[in-house]
């Protein structure tokens, strides 16, 4: 049985940091494998340094400006996902990640639906996200939920020199 647990930095901070390191290691390994890049060298940072440099805004997300969920399956943290409001009506889906052993079980779709539902409760009528071009399973989930490709948006956390390897998507509820 799965459970979505709202992130509490007093309880989950270390696990959330570990999940983000695992997520970033996966992102950069796939980026390098799919495009023959040495992306970390181009950024001049290690994965833990990148996570430490980018984690603080996530640790401060609180409803109704945003929320982070951890997906717990049989007592184990199986995945994560976040929503951050970019404006009164626009939310961004961020850091959707399932650990490899939990992929293919529908948890990504369930997490996305949870984040969209909460985003609507927070007043969002439009949602944005970015996803790697090689992440076909994730793209399928997003397209099935009504997301369509759009141009880059300035709030994306993807470094400008890596954006050509990502898709940017948006879903409008109107």
Language model features by range: what are they?
Residues 119-131:
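Conserved GNAT acetyl-CoA-binding A-motif
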Residues 102, 106:
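Glycine-rich phosphate-binding loop
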